[in-house]
């Protein structure tokens, strides 16, 4: 693999400089397909959007799936490396945004290509079937399901083992972290639309202020983890988006909240999502907005 280092570094720098948003990974997907097709894999593109599935059969044996993600994030990169991302685009709402590989997917793709090269070059040392998949829209928590719904496990060999990784800045270079049980959390994206009755900021008594209600919801959500779940159960509820209002002196008629929810068990996930619904309903009733 040492001989592959220069070309893999070059690939990494290219991917880092040219990120694409979730479900828009057209060029990234094509590059992954190009890289792995050159190794003799049978490649299918546009699985579940811009997903890629590559199969390499090497006699009888187990089927192993190796997965990478593709998408970047709407984040502006501040850096001075020669391959800094200067990519800008429009998001799904039509807003102009910068794009960056801020979560390591450029590194994941490079590792994926490197692993494919190593395995394709050492077919005399293993038997079985490889299924290499490149998954779109990981950041939105929707790409894996899109590929499954598009027949991932029906159109292609079903794996006995699935392998994936996530880079971790907390680990020293050359160190691998492994654990029994969940290593990373599942993610849910939750959108909450808080309705109110807008009006003049100097006469709040004539309104139902959705900013106040939304603020109460944000604070109440933090009690789910601290007061409803077992103290050692790992849960994260983060409000990453709070949008509402257009002017200083106008109370708006709605506020949009955007959450990311991270859990490590199906049972806890259901509890958390139900608690979010209950809190929103209850605070809406308390604010005199039972249907909002």
Predicted regions located by residue number:
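A conserved active-site cap/scaffold subdomain adjacent to cofactor or substrate pockets
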Residues: 248-274, 291
């Amino acid at each position: 693999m040492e001989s592959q280092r220069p070309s893999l570094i070059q690939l990494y720098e290219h991917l880092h400089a040219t990120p694409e948003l979730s479900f828009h990974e057209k060029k990234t997907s094509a590059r992954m397909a190009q890289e792995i097709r050159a190794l003799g894999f049978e490649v299918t593109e546009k699985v579940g959007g811009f997903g890629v599935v590559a199969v390499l059969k090497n006699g009888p044996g187990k089927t192993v799936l190796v997965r990478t993600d593709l998408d970047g994030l709407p984040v502006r990169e501040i850096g001075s490396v020669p391959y800094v991302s200067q990519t800008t685009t429009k998001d799904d709402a039509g807003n102009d945004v910068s794009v960056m590989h801020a979560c390591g997917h450029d590194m994941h793709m490079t590792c994926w290509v490197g692993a494919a090269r190593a395995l394709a070059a050492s077919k005399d040392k293993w038997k079985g079937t490889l299924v290499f998949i490149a998954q779109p829209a990981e950041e939105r928590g929707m790409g894996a399901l899109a590929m499954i719904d598009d027949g991932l496990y029906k159109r292609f060999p079903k794996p006995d083992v699935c392998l994936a990784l996530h880079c971790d800045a907390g680990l020293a270079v050359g160190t691998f972290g492994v654990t029994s049980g969940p290593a990373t959390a599942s993610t849910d994206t939750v959108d909450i639309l808080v309705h109110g009755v807008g009006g003049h900021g100097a006469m709040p008594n004539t309104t139902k202020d959705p900013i106040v209600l939304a603020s109460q919801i944000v604070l109440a959500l933090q009690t789910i983890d601290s007061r409803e779940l077992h103290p050692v159960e790992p849960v994260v509820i983060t409000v990453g988006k709070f949008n509402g209002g257009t002017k200083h002196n106008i109370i708006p008629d709605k506020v949009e909240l955007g959450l990311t929810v991270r859990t490590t068990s199906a049972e806890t996930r259901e509890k958390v999502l139900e608690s979010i619904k209950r809190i929103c309903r209850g605070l809406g009733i308390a604010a005199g907005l039972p249907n909002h």
